[in-house]
Structure formats: C-alpha cells, structure tokens
C-alpha cells in the first residue's frame, strides 16, 4: 500500500477512536467503567487545562474540598461532570454553567477510601476534556453517620443558606453553605435524604446555571461559583423529598 493510501486510511478513522487511544494518566482500573457510565462512551481526551484540585490526603474523609477549574476552555464549555472513582456512590455533581457563569466549581464531598478524582468537561464540539487528580484517605467518609443529625434543632435549620457575594474585577464570587444532612442511604436505618438540584437565577427568575448534586456531597454542603458581571442573583435548591429552598445572594 502506498504512503498516500496509508495517510488516507488514518484520516478516515473515527474521531472517538483516535481520542480514546490516550492512556489514563492515573492508570485506574475503573476508568473505562466510568467512561461508559458517566460519559456514555463518548469521545474524550485527557486535558491538563481542566484543573482538579484536591488535598493529597483527606484529613476528614467526610469533608474533602474539590476545586474544578475549566476556565482555560473558555466559552466552549457545555457541562462539567465530577466523580470519585472508588466511592460506593461515585458521582459528585453535574454542572451546566450557562453563558453568564464561569466554568468553575468548589465543593466538599465524601470519600470512602483513597481514590482517583475526575472532572470531565464537555465542549461544544462534543468532546469530553478530562482532568484527573488523586486523594489519599484513611477511609470511612461515606459510611460514617451524620453529624448534623446529632445536633439539636437541625430540622428547624434545614435549608438555611449562609454565605455571601464577593465582588471581583470581572464578576462576583458566590460562596455559601446550606444546612442539610445529605444522607446517602449507606447508614443503617436512615434512607437517602439529600439536596439534588440547584439553580443560580437572576432577579427575574431566569436560570443562569444548573447544578445536579449526588449523595457523595458532604453534609451541610459548601459551594463556590463565579458569575460574570455584577448582577444580583438568587439560589434555588430542592432535595429528593421535594423540599424547596431559596436565598438571595
């Protein structure tokens, strides 16, 4: 076969096959499983522009900070998925930032053991850009009983939002904490009870960003987002029992 014919063959190879040929930088035995389950087997590339920042060791496995930054991909970001590969409940969040919200999320989550952490960013061309990190942990963060439920009066504080808005040069940083036990169903006798939906809205009720949360998120969840410009915003939340909460930010 001539060289020109060989080049033609490689040119006609499907895009997803070329992208999927990349080796996993963390060599995780669970990568292919989550590629199929979370990303539906769609084209991907491991991309250092997607920053996934976690501590090297989780001092408290029930409260592990994660910072996902996809600003290097600019306005091409459609959605961000984050998960901990060896957790009994791997998925942490699914974030659709919208045009007025920066593709950046900071949140706290639980880990059951040392695990690879992934954030996959879908861009407008249909390719997932995957950032990776790893956190070591003594373990037990997912199966530990809730601390919130031991505190008197936690039911009266359910859904209370504490936080603020911090002005920046090109926009605003929203930092908040929501009172909620975030029960994941792994503790005997306590069913799932967790915040599963959140939206950032403008004052007219238009949705600027959506965030789907999973039971891996820590109790009394903390969240940081960035909004472009200096418009007033509101946060709307709902848990899996249908309780709705709202707060001005």
Where are these regions (language model features)?
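N-terminal edge beta-strand
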Residues: 33-63, 151-169
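Short amphipathic, basic-aromatic surface patches that mediate peripheral association
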Residues: 70, 177-191
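Short beta-strand edge segments in extracellular beta-sheet folds
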Residues: 134-140, 249
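Surface-exposed, short loops/turns at beta-strand junctions within beta-sandwich domains
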Residues: 108-114, 226-231
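Short, aromatic- and glycine-rich surface loops/edge beta-strands on solvent-exposed regions
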Residues: 80, 115-123, 231-241
